[in-house]
Structures are given as C-alpha cells and as structure tokens.
Amino acid sequence: MLARIAALTERPRSFIRSFKYRRTDSIPNSSRREMDFTDLDSNATKCVNLRLCSVSGCMTEILEIRADRPSFHVVFVPGNPGVITFYKEFVESLFKSLGGTASVSAVGASGHTEKNWEHGKLYSLQEQIDHKIEFIKVQNIEAPLVLVGHSIGSYIALEMLRRLPEKAMYCIGLYPFLALNLQSKKQAVIVKVIMSRVLSTMVTLFVASLRLLPRQVLRLISELSNGKSWSNTAHEACCSHLPQYHTIRNVLYMARTEFIKLSETPDWEFMRENQEKISFLYGIDDHWGPLQMFEEVSRQASGIALSIEREGHTHGFCCTEAGSIWVARHIASLIKNKLAR
C-alpha cells in the first residue's frame, strides 16, 4: 500500500538536519558559465540542509544547497506526494552536476510534512501553485530562476513560468503529468478512489494506521513493497511521512484537484508562446506522462525541447540513487546548452 500511495503522484531546531555533499573548487566565472562537469574536487564538502520555512503562514519543508556565488537559482517542485526528503540524492547530484554555479531549493508541498503543523488543513493544486510563488517572494531570490518540476510539479512549474515571466529563464518538466491519460487503467482506479469520499476515507485510515506499527516493521513493509533498488533515504521518507494522517489526506485531496484540473485541455497557446524556455523529459513506460503525450506536445509546440529517458529508470526516479544521478546530469546538460545559446 505504501508503494501505491508513493506512486500517486514533493520551527524547532531539532527538525533541521544536515547532510554532506561534494562540490567543486572555486573556478573562474567563464568556466562557471560553461559548467565543466569533469573538474570536481573530491576533497571539498559542504552541507545540504532540510529546514522549515514559513510561507504564507504554512510551515514548509525545504531541502536546500546554497552556492557561494550563484549565477542562477534552481527552484524544484516535487510530484505528489510532495515529501521533499525523497529528493535528497537528486538535489545533491544536481548541485554537483552544476559545478556549484547555482543554488538549489527543493520546496515541499503544503501539508505534506512529517509533523501536522497546519492542523489538518487540506491544500488544492491551485493552493500549491500559489504556495510556490509565495516561496520565491518570501525568500527574495534575486538570481534568475530555473524552474524544475517532477510529475504534477511540472504543471506547477509551468504555472510559475506563467506568473513569473521576467524572472524565470527556463522551465524543465521531469516525467510531466500535464493531462489525464484516458488509456491508463491505473489512473481509472485512482479516480474511483479519490472521487469517492468513502473510498478515500478508507484508504486514509488504513495507511494512517500503519504508523502504529514499530518503525522496523514499517521499514520492512517498505522494503518488501518497493524493492532493494530504493535508496535508504527513500525508505525513510516513505516511513516517516506517508503514514501520517494529515499527509495522506493531503496526498489524496491534492490528487483529486489534480484530476479535475487536468481533465481540461492543456494550454497549448501558452506553451507555444514560451516554447524556447521549456523542456520536458519523458519515460518509456510512464502512465503519468505517456509517449502519446510526448507526441502531442511535439505536434502542438514543436519548439519545446523533448527527451525520452531510455536508461531503465522509472517515474519515481528520485527513489533510487542511480535515477537521481542520471536525471540530475540530464538537467545540468539542458541548462548548460541553454546558457550556451
């Protein structure tokens, strides 16, 4: 069940955690602009922080790495579940792949936190979009923005591009969920659950009841359900956040509002108008971002840079170290090519 929920779709000092990552030596600005991925110093270290930030009164989990002299700022929006700790290895790999030229802020979804800071308040897709816009205002980010979104986060990133046209220089969607897939049996099942108050309540209560189990048992369930390919970080994120009653309620409620909104036709006109600023990465077997959508984007907005990942990673790339590293390097390559124009 934890695996299925994970597939749906990113105050106290004791909450703040630090991790180690590697970074490059200081290099000239010209080299920074070219983003040389090979000249990395294996001896230098710095901390990546998981911190709480109040955004419009909503306590938000932020996974962040700050560059000393950033030439741009990457703001990452997760999919649903919007548990940002799933993306630890990805954020580390992205910062490293960019050679320390950019700060990276990964912004968790409102209400998808480990603790129930918002006392059970539910957040819709539109409220998640507003939340990400407000984060940028609160942080007073001055450097040019590169917006990166995963799954429904890709849709959110596009809406951020719409509302921040002067500040956002690039928008990258990873395994993007931009419209309903009427051919997907999995999505048909999900629709029945999230649109039914009875079924969604039953799922919520069942998943939330799992937190009563010892942590070791929860971890075993996660490992048996998701397999050995998942990273330790992904298993921990699954066990710490998803069984929380307030989190799973928000996951299902957000999914409900996603399916309602994405039943509409995508705004192709907006994508055509901004096609030089947009890139999408699709997967081979991904019902959230199927290849027929890849083909439709290609027809509707031919100037959008489209790629297909053929390395065997999944929609949940962030749950494996190999997937996190590959996608991070792909993003760095896209940005490098964009800046070289």
Language model segments and positions:
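Active-site loop/oxyanion-hole signature of alpha/beta-hydrolase fold enzymes
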Residues: 106-146
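Short, surface-exposed "cap/lid" segments of acyl-processing enzymes
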Residues: 52-114
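Catalytic active-site module of serine/aspartate enzymes centered on a nucleophile-bearing elbow/loop
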Residues: 3, 276, 302-341
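Conserved serine/cysteine hydrolase catalytic core
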Residues: 243-299, 308-309
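Gly/Ala-rich beta-loop-alpha elbow adjacent to hydrolase catalytic centers
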Residues: 148-153, 157
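Conserved alpha/beta-hydrolase catalytic His-Asp/Glu region
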Residues: 211-253, 263-265
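Flexible "cap/lid" loop of the alpha/beta hydrolase fold
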Residues: 162, 166-202
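N-terminal cap/lid segment of alpha/beta-hydrolase-fold proteins
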Residues: 34-59
